[in-house]
């Protein structure tokens, strides 16, 4: 027992030393420098990412678009049929129901929470203080076999069941390369409400002077499986027709 306590004390001391040697401002600024610089990020008008998502033995084509206006969509192709998910036109949030194959509008609460993402394009950490966010180092953890700084980011509150709720996410930065390798967040709505979602990033490649992760993996902490995504191309400042975001009119 004494040995276990001694090990725990050493681990805590080491973690504290590592964290104190680097400030959260240094981590965030170094990260932004490593992926191309804050000014280049702030000049972005939009991104279009195309690739494939692995679902079991199937590879599903996927396309993700996000604009600085807040408009966004994710389009997935399943056996030749296209399904749009999390489509936001600036006012309405909607998705195609996989079972009925019909468009459905999201709840007012989900739409409000989703709309807050406009403030975070292309990166929630850009000008985070000016946005009123708070960031702090809460330790180090091992992510995919490598040490990473764990940064707690507190953003503007969201609504959960009609009540204003703290919006806290955890960002993990590789201690050597100082790039983002994982984001941890709580699922706030839907059948997985209350679960912890992990989004992992890797394979950073340059696109017109900025570096983006060409590999992502979305998973629920403690659950088997996941949804690895491999991007084949990333286009900056794409031209996208407004109709791509509009809720389909009734036939």
Roles of regions detected by a PLM:
Residues 22-101, 134-137:
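N-terminal mature ectodomain segment of secretory-pathway/periplasmic proteins
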Residues 14-18:
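N-terminal signal peptide c-region/cleavage motif recognized by signal peptidases
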Residues 21-29, 33, 40, 92-163, ...:
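Flexible, processing/modification-adjacent segments and terminal tails
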Residues 62-66, 85-89, 104-111, 199-200, ...:
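Short amphipathic beta-strand/extended segments with alternating polar/hydrophobic composition
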Residues 1-8:
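Bacterial N-terminal signal peptides that target proteins for export
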Residues 88, 95, 140, 172-173, ...:
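Hydrophobic beta-strand positions
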Residues 79, 147-246:
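Gly/Pro-enriched, hydrophobic low-complexity segments
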């Amino acid at each position: 027992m004494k040995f276990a306590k001694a090990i725990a004390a050493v681990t805590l001391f080491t973690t504290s030393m590592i964290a104190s040697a680097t400030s959260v401002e240094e981590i965030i600024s170094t990260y932004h420098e490593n992926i191309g610089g804050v000014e280049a990020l702030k000049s972005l008008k939009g991104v279009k990412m195309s690739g494939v998502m692995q679902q079991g033995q199937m590879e599903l084509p996927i396309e993700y678009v996000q604009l600085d206006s807040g408009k966004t969509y994710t389009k997935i192709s399943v056996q030749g049929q296209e399904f749009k998910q999390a489509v936001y036109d600036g006012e309405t949030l909607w998705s195609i129901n996989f079972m009925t194959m019909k468009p459905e509008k999201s709840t007012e609460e989900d739409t409000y929470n989703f709309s807050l993402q406009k403030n975070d394009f292309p990166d929630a950490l850009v000008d985070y203080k000016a946005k009123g966010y708070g960031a702090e180092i809460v330790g180090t953890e091992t992510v995919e076999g490598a040490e990473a700084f764990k940064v707690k980011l507190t953003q503007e509150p969201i609504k959960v069941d009609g009540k204003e709720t703290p919006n806290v996410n955890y960002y993990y930065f590789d201690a050597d390369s100082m790039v983002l390798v994982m984001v941890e967040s709580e699922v706030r709505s839907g059948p997985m409400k209350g679960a912890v979602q992990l989004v992992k990033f890797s394979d950073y490649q340059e696109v017109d002077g900025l570096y983006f992760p060409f590999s992502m993996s979305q998973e629920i902490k403690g659950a088997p499986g996941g949804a690895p995504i491999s991007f084949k191309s990333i286009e900056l400042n794409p031209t996208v027709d407004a109709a791509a975001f509009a809720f389909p009119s009734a036939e």
